[in-house]
């Protein structure tokens, strides 16, 4: 069950990338795995993060990230390097083939979804269309 928003996320359309079938709908970079582990250290009652999608922004869709205390019945579960990410039923098709990364700079830090299925993004990178 999701409890609250964890972080903001940026979406990037990846052009010219070949889709390579994987077992998981979503793959995590080592930086994303490390950040998720760090976030969950302070939340012993939470078992992972939940990725969802909602109507928002100038391009229509936006990803959401929440803490998850359990896997809901229709969630897809991704387990990688000791962390669990649950994908909400409504977000499953939009995340196929996506890589979840965590990027830090001097001014910001955020999860980034590198999604080859996105047709367009807004200027700020927070919303996308498929």
Swiss-Prot record:
Transit peptide feature range:
1-24
Q: What does this protein do?
A: Involved in the assembly of mitochondrial iron-sulfur proteins. Probably involved in the binding of an intermediate of Fe/S cluster assembly. Required for maintenance of circadian rhythms under constant darkness.
| UniProt GO MF annotations | 2 iron, 2 sulfur cluster binding; metal ion binding
> Where is it made, tissue-wise?
Detected in head.
Q: Where does Fe cation bind?
A: 58, 122, 124
Kindly state which keywords UniProt assigns to this record, in alphabetical order. Iron, Iron-sulfur, Metal-binding, Mitochondrion, Transit peptide
Kindly list the biological process annotations in GO that this record carries.
Answer: [4Fe-4S] cluster assembly; iron-sulfur cluster assembly; response to magnetism
What is the annotated signal peptide range for this record?
Answer: none
Per the record, the similarity remark reads:
Belongs to the HesB/IscA family.
The record's subunit annotation is: Interacts with cry.
Tell me which Gene3D superfamilies the record gives. HesB-like domain (2.60.300.12)
What is the protein name given in its UniProt record? Iron-sulfur cluster assembly 1 homolog, mitochondrial
Q: Where in the cell is it found?
A: Mitochondrion
Q: Which GO cellular component terms are attached?
A: cytoplasm; mitochondrial [4Fe-4S] assembly complex; mitochondrial matrix; mitochondrion
């Amino acid at each position: 069950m999701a409890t609250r928003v964890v972080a903001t996320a940026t979406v990037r359309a990846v052009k010219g990338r070949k889709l390579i079938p994987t077992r998981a709908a979503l793959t995590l970079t080592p930086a994303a795995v490390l950040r998720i582990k760090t976030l969950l250290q302070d939340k012993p009652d939470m078992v992972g993060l939940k990725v969802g999608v909602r109507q928002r922004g100038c391009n229509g869709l936006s990803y959401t990230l929440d803490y998850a205390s359990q896997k809901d019945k229709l969630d897809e579960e991704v387990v990688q390097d000791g962390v669990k990410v649950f994908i909400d039923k409504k977000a499953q098709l939009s995340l196929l083939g996506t890589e979840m990364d965590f990027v830090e700079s001097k001014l910001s830090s955020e999860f980034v979804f590198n999604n080859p299925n996105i047709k367009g993004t807004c200027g700020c990178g927070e919303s996308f269309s498929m």
